[in-house]
Amino acid sequence: MALPPDRPDFTDLATPSDHKALKRLADMDTATSASSEPESQKRGPSGAVLGALIAPGSPSFFRNWLLSALLLLLGFVIPVATVVVALVRRNEITSLVLDENFLLALQVIAVLFVVTRLISVVEVIRSRSEGSPRRLASTLGVFGVILLALPAVWSVARANDLSGVINDVFVSSGSDDPLAANGDASGDGFKTILLLGGDEGPGRWALRTDTMILVTIHEESGRIAMISIPRNMYKMQFPPGSAMANEFPKGFPELANAIYPYVFTHEEISATYVRGDLQPEAIALASGISYSMNITIDDYVLVNMQGFLEIIDALGGVTLTLDEELPMPGNIPGAKTQYPPFIGPGEVTMDGTTALGYARSRSGDSDYGRMGRQRELLTAIASQVEGSDILSRFPNLTEIMRWTVRTSLSAGEFSSLVDRLRSGASINESVGLIPPLINPGNPNFTDITNLIDALQASIRDDVDFPYA
């Protein structure tokens, strides 16, 4: 534009040094303008989006530090802290994954993990100028959020499934009242749980409890003893006035493993043992064992033996050392492979099918021999399972537990039992109510009571069991 005639042009009067000074001022002004741009504008689209996906809120820290700090806390710090806690407490992972509050927290954290990254990516996109940088940031952001959302959605679904299993398998809260009390204070300081292995298959009369093991825990020391009850024990007594006592005043005339199916098939008797959602057949059996042996039974755990096979497979197997060769049984319903004629001697790693055959075999000895093997197998499983194994295999375990396990324990009580059993050193004594100690065909229940009292005293006082 031309200067008015009354204003002279002094440009021609400027010296070379003046031109240099003006150029320096222009460069400084350009640098100042660039430094005042948002930090996210100085990064490329891919770098800003990557920062938002890894550490949500970090790209927008200089624009809105409060929002950035909140996103970073909810989307990065808390998830990382949760993973660290799970790793540090991996030996207690059973109690964590069976805690409904923990599962709910996991679901909330998974949702926040995705939402915080979505918000951070939107902030990055809004900070870009119109055109190709914004389009590139949008494309990268959407792809990244979807990619991270997939494992988060899977985690929420698994946690929700596990919550369903907890509600199906366990009672909502543990009861302070024992399942079957005997009115004797000799068992004070102990918690006793009845483990039942239900053998349901072709030719069976409902569900027969061929495996019955009392796990008695000295609560102060954590020491544990296991007592196997023979399936062929006769004359089981019941508390006076109960439906089973009225039906069988001289004792149950059949094998002990027939009590469960008898109650199951007689609704008029089963109805008298109803207690919430618990199995009335298990309550009736527990009351008979409690009264006959003068021991308070606090809870029960019932496992279908087919589920026992599946549980061992889901845990990756179990290893036992056999002192001698053991003949294996014929084909068992549900077995996944054909049994070899023998296993052992020496170290044997068993899958679920082999372990079930080991626990069920009577070919090499008798019912009494297999009772001892069942206790050995339970001890081995409990002591060999690592917390990391439970965590990595839990999705399979939960589905198996849904249809194979029923119990009067709450999820918290069950996880505490598993944690105690996993400490193999805490299982101090193991005994079967078998000859020559006990005659199952004509049992003297006073002798059984004395034996159990001595067993509890031995683990309470940490002394040798006199009947061993």
Predicted regions and their residues:
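Internal/C-terminal transmembrane anchor helices
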Residues: G131-S163
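Membrane-embedded alpha-helical segments of integral membrane proteins
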Residues: G75-R128
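Hydrophobic, aromatic-rich membrane-embedded alpha-helical segments
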Residues: E39-A69, L73-F76
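Membrane-water interface of alpha-helical transmembrane segments
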Residues: K42, W65, A69, L96-A110, ...
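Cytoplasmic membrane-interface segments at the C-terminal ends of transmembrane helices
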Residues: P59-L66, R117-A137
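N-terminal targeting leaders characterized by basic, low-complexity, disordered sequences
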Residues: M1-T32, F62-L70, L74
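Membrane-interfacial, low-structure loops and terminal tails that flank and connect transmembrane helices
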Residues: A31-E39
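Non-catalytic, solvent-exposed segments at the cell envelope interface
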Residues: A157-A468
